[in-house]
Amino acid sequence: MSLRLYDSYGQDAVISDLVSWGGLMGPFHDYFERGNLDIFSGLGSCLSGPVCAMNLTSDGSGDHHGWYCNYVEVTMSESRRRSCSQEKFEVEQWLARDASPYEL
């Protein structure tokens, strides 16, 4: 699962693999499964403006690659002490090829 965040100036930040970037749930947690709350945390550069859009994408791998996402909450930080932007995106849709909107 990857995440691309955008600001209103056209800048973006890309996390190509959420789990390896900052999965906090432990080595035996089954990420992206029904009923689970998955939490990720990592550091990166802040965008020029607040996060205003995001693109969450599945690579379609795995036996049961479909995943229903309720929401994505993002806090952009350059350090543990300085937060640049926080936003919550309501998603409420499947990321799957076999359920509407049939997109990963």
Curated annotation (Swiss-Prot):
InterPro entries linked: PLAT/LH2_dom, PLAT/LH2_dom_sf
Ranges that cross the membrane: none
Signal peptide location: none
Lineage: Eukaryota, Viridiplantae, Streptophyta, Embryophyta, Tracheophyta
The name this protein goes by in its record: PLAT domain-containing protein 3
Top-rank taxon: Eukaryota
Domain PLAT: 1-104
Xref: PROSITE patterns: PLAT
